[in-house]
Amino acid sequence: MQVYSIQAILPVLMADFSATEVQAGMVVGATILAIAIMSPFLGMLSDAVGRKSFVVGALLFLTLPTALIAQSTTIEWIGLWRFLQGLSVPGITVVTIAYIGEEFEGRAVTELMSFYVSGSVLGGFMGRFLLGHLHELIGWRAGYYVMAAMTLLGALWVTKMLPVSRQFVANPNFRSAIQTLGSHLVNRYVVTACLLGACVLFSLVGCFTFINLYLADTPYHLGTGALANIFAVYLIGVIITPLSTILLRRFGSARTIIVAVIISMLGVLLTLATPLWLIVIGLGVMSSGVFVTQSATISYIAVNVKQGRSLASGLYYLFYYAGGTVGAWLCSLAYAYGQWQFTVWLLLFVQVLALLIASFGMIKTKSKAA
């Protein structure tokens, strides 16, 4: 919930701190940059010490900077606390993917990855929705205290409910981890998935960060509550993403991703329409295509990578969140230069790159699991 919740209140923060579009983009990108930096390292560390304890510890750490955002006096302080938030997130995301890949096999992995992505989608919606409406009720500062309390409760829930790993085998050998890293960097499955991941989050962050500024401005003038409601389009992804397993089993990862990216591009084009209802439909179509792409991509790794899964997941998330960081920055420049229309053309360019990667980079084997 914490990574993108700030998008719902960006127009308010820009007004409160007299921030520019580029500064707003970097506040969003700060968390994503930290996640990109830490993902492979936390992946290696988790391979050495375990899974459940890592997830719980990361959730507990995440509580602190979330609460400290409420004390920020400048946009730069918000950026710092957002960066610290990002340091803990890979301990949740990377390790969870490795946990699923180790504890389950075959079709179950693909299905659980789809449910994992659906949960991430739901969390992304809830973070933006809650913070947007909390701002209208009690202000964004108090809203962040509520978000911190919810994160703490989440840590306690995971402590009680998540089963201890049964299949985990510790690998404390750092030299072995480096060798595994080297093999991943020349593994076509891993490299292709990493490049696709970068394109996926570039598109998602660029679109859903700056559509807020666009809809808060003339002629729409949407407030934080209305902007938070826009993110309800994420809920379509909660339904569609698990259904994507049917496509994956029938057509394979590559074909599924190609179709999903094309659908996402059509959604981005729809946001150029003037009526608000068409823009909302476009966002729903765009995000659904992105979520199916992400689900297919991480399943592609989980099914085809047998050794060093946590490190492979870490590499994927390094590229995934690096793409989001670059997306926040480049789209901020595009929006500052040519408003939403220029941002759309940039998003379409990156999605064309994703099409090329899926078409020529992925190994097109149809698998019962992938």
PLM region descriptions:
Residues 1-21, 39-42, 207-213:
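Extracytoplasmic
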Residues 18, 50, 71-77, 88, ...:
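Helix-breaking motifs and short loop linkers at transmembrane-helix boundaries and internal kinks
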Residues 37-76:
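Conserved MFS/SLC helix-loop-helix module at the cytosolic interface between two early adjacent transmembrane helices
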Residues 65, 76-84, 277-285:
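Paired small-residue
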Residues 77, 106, 114-162:
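Helix-loop-helix hairpin linking two adjacent transmembrane segments in secondary transporters
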Residues 81-122:
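Cytoplasmic helix-loop-helix junction between adjacent transmembrane helices
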Residues 163-193:
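Juxtamembrane intracellular "pre-TM" segments in multi-pass secondary transporters
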Residues 254-297:
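C-terminal transmembrane helical hairpin of 12-TM major facilitator-type secondary transporters
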